[in-house]
Amino acid sequence: MNQPVMQGVPALNVPDYVKHPRLVAWVGEVAALTKPERIVWCDGSQEEYDRLCAEMVAAGTMKQLNPAKRKNSYLALSDPSDVARVEDRTFICSQKKEDAGPTNNWTAPAEMRQTLNGLFDGSMRGRTLYVVPFSMGPLGSPIAHIGVELSDSPYVAVNMRIMTRMGRAVYDVLGTDGDFVPCVHTVGKPLAAGEKDVPWPCNPTKYIVHFPETREIWSFGSGYGGNALLGKKCFALRIASTMGRDQGWLAEHMLILGVTSPEGKTYHVAAAFPSACGKTNFAMLIPPAGLNGWKVTTIGDDIAWIKPRQDANGKTRLYAINPEAGYFGVAPGTSEKTNFNAMATLKENVIFTNVALTDDGDVWWEGMTDTPPAHLIDWQGQDWTPASAKETGRKAAHPNARFTAPAAQCPSIDPEWDNPAGVPIDAFIFGGRRSTTVPLVTEARDWTEGVYMAATMGSETTAAAAGQQGVVRRDPFAMLPFCGYNMADYFAHWLKVGEKLADSGATLPKIFCVNWFRKDENGKFVWPGFGENMRVLKWMIDRIEGQAQGEEHVFGVSPRYEELSWDGLDFTAEQFAKVISLDADAWKQELALHDELFTKLAHGLPQALPDAKTRLEERLGG
């Protein structure tokens, strides 16, 4: 299946175990366009990982950390211009503009392909093209899908080995004609003969482009995270959400956790929170003192793929997998206090990006310890001391600094996390960061009301001053930056999934809305959060089991004070009233803001949602 050298394109060097002619032809086409110096087919082995890491250390891209402190771990420092996802350079190039909808950037596919062809022509000159085969989800799972990323970044190759099931076994699943999502990535910095490379190559021009109908992803100019690790947001959410729309399943920006009661019964919950709302902390929650015998296990911390199928009793249920195999988490704010399990996961085999380096060869970031070290090398490679930070306000770690760590290292990992069949979902949770208005926890009375809650959820983008509401950014289902098609059609898809389940006689998962972030009149958080969120989770399970009555109000059903377990926590009925109360005037203003969202998404908006809003207004008495 090999091809001769032609037009300056290197030999493809196809390994014997790759038996997929369409894949080989595609690699040849991309190589002819991008003109790399050589092609390497990644096999996912430890030897390959170690070799690529050693090459990056030699190139100055990464530093090996002190093995006595962090075994087999590395620190990469990016270019200061390449530190986060670039939403304004992210495009959904569907055939029709209305299929992308008003919340996505759209360009006509033919026009975009012309632009990309110009950018990618010769873009890998002087570099190695890595062929990175990966499975999103356990190999061979009926819920999983396969992708192949062609990238000129060794940083991408090693991160994809941690974040996905990457390597030779993927070709066994693909066989000779299996489907795969083609992903092409370049840092966009070709090297002339003899030109010295920089430690973190990238290009000021950036494009992250998705073609939903052909299930293709093209990324130019960035070496960072979600822009370059194309299995993550690009495939697992943007492309997969369109696959789910077409095939009747869900690709969601959700953690998945297991909860086991003292009696030994296990439940599974999927929860969607926008960034900076504690998703990873909730996924790795440790129950507090007073809730002995309860256990929380982690299946995933970021993405869930959910497909309906029959269980052993012939009942249709929604089954979920974590399509990833690692955690790509935000480091700042993570500590043994806020997330003990995450810190335990980070002891070895980790790639850190844009955190600070300690004098003894370990890592540090803001929030890791109460007192920072006396001296650090910051994320830009400069000396940093607490005094210089005070003077200049400079952070030691970039606020979006990341860790890439294998999921299997998490102490709270669920024994079923790698089960190809997935786990059955008993409840969905949606939540944002709101200092006022939204109660601690509310259960939707039915699926449509739950979809309404999720469609209108939001988070404050600015710290709210006392008595003043922050600017609320609507982030429907926490999917605003990640939905690969028209958001109004996405709402309709959720309603349809619920209808189909109901028609099959299934018991639908309950839907809850939470808000851990209510503040008092002094601007202080009222609810303690973190492990104490288990008390709310326990009430949800009591509701699933029909053991808690709750109290119905305008917006759904919330717990009575006595229905939550307060053992080990001093939290008064007055404090509880502050986090659970509903202010009618605030809700009238809130519903007016929901109107703004619905006006923006009017094209294709399911009538069920304005109808649900009308019912809420009637209950409010106005």
Curated annotation (Swiss-Prot):
Upper taxonomic lineage: Bacteria, Pseudomonadati, Pseudomonadota, Betaproteobacteria, Burkholderiales
Q: Which protein is depicted?
A: Phosphoenolpyruvate carboxykinase [GTP]
One GO BP annotation of this record? cellular response to glucose stimulus
Which residues are involved in binding Mn(2+)?
K233, H253, D302
Point out the gene that encodes the protein.
pckG
Question: One Pfam family from the UniProt entry?
Answer: PEPCK_GTP
| Organism the protein comes from | Ralstonia pickettii (strain 12J)
The protein's predominant localisation is: cytoplasm
Which reaction(s) does its UniProt entry say it catalyses? oxaloacetate + GTP = phosphoenolpyruvate + GDP + CO2
Where along this sequence does the record place binding of GTP? A276, C277, G278, K279, T280, N281, R402, R433, F530, G531, E532, N533
